[in-house]
Every structure is written in C-alpha cells, then in structure tokens.
Amino acid sequence: MPHAAGRPASPAQTSGEELANSLTHGLGVGLSIAGLVVMVVAAARHGTARDVVGAAIFGSMLILLYLMSTLYHALRGPKVKLVFKVFDHSAIFLLIAGTYTPFCLSSLGRTRPAWGWTIFGLVWGLAVLGITFKGVFYGRIAKSTLRPPPLDHLHPPIVTPVNPAFVRRMGWISTLIYLAMGWLIVVPILAGLVGGVPVGEILPPRGLYWLFGGGLIYSLGALVYSLEKVRYHHALWHLFVVGGSACHVFAVLFHVIPGKVGP
C-alpha cells in the first residue's frame, strides 16, 4: 500500500529531497481534491446515496493521506515532525479502509451485500487497530528520542532507550496489519467463485484491471522505497503512490459508480 510498513527511520534526507517529497505529495493533494469532486458528482448523477457516500469517503481519505504526508515532509523540528509522522502513518490505514469503502458499499453492496458489510466492518476495525498501534509505538519512540532538558547537572532526566528488537517486532506487527487489510479483497472474490457468483458480476474485468493495477504500482513503489541509498528515492516512491491512487480512482469512477463506462 501507500507506505512501507513499520520500517526503521530512513537516513536523514537533504533539504532538497524533503522539498521534492513535499511537492510530489502536494501534487497528490490537488489531484485528490479533483478526484473527490469528480467522483461525488458522478455518483450523485448516476448512482444512489450509497455510491455518493462511498465516493466521498474514498476521496476524503485520499486528501487526508496526501495532506498529512506533505505537511510531515515540509515541517521542521523533531517534535512536530514526530507528531506528523504519526498522522502520516495513521492516514495510511485510513486510506486503505477508504479505498475499500466504495467497493464494499457499491460493488459488493449490489451483488453480495452480506460480504460487503462484513469486509467494510473488518477493514475499518483493522484501521482503528493500526492507528492505535502506531500511536502507542511512536509514543514509546517519543519518550526515548525527544529527551527533555536536564533539571541540573546532578539530576539528569531518566530516559529508557528503545530496544532495537522492540522496533523490529513492532515493524512486523504493522506489516501484518497492512497485509491483512490489503488482502481482504480476495476473500469475497473467492467466496463468490465458490458460491457461483462470477467475478464480473461483482466488478467488471476492466475495473479489476484498474484495481489490481493500482495495487501493483503501489508494490513497485515499495521496491523504490527500499532504495534508501539512492538520492530522491522517496520522492520517486511518492510518484508511484500517486499513480496507484489514480488507478483506484479510475476503477471507482468508471466501474463502481453505476452508469459510468470508461477505460
């Protein structure tokens, strides 16, 4: 999905790299606002209230993710940086859940409503779990890294360092939550096949191409994200994230909202 999960902090980036990081996801903010407007208008014209709600939630979560990421990279100072890092990583969970929402309410809602509401509840529950986890994890980091000034030279503050094993363990937990959320979409598809419901009745083939194409672009971006020794790798990864989001917007706009037919 949009971010790599639970990795230790990357080496410090230059001011030029952070500017590029801010600009690339600032672009995402603008495109997300446009996507929200277009999806909601299309849903209002061609769909039902359920389609409007799904499109609005998805578009809003896109804006939230890109806005938090832009601010995180643009702001300076360790305290505010850590706060917005929590917001940034929490927004990932919200975007995953938000991306599921129109598919749960509209695509599955029209063909497999029980599955639609089940996946909807599970994915948003996992999002809440993930956000809680991130808050606790980074709260622990803050206590260790944001050291208060000593009271005097005889009574320095007592700070417990974070165990590297703890960081790795929390990283694995975070990764498992992301993976569980990302792969939930396979469950109703397989259940539909077992139950005799063709996948095409849930989502047209071209819609599936956009859906899984977006996931593939996100995954390729994760590989770019891992190239920490390459300058501006983070900004390049941001462009992959924007591309993955665009694919999912096209899937919703042209193949989830009723009456819309497109590429």
Q: How should these model regions be labeled?
A:
Residues 1-263:
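Multi-pass alpha-helical transmembrane bundles in non-GPCR membrane proteins
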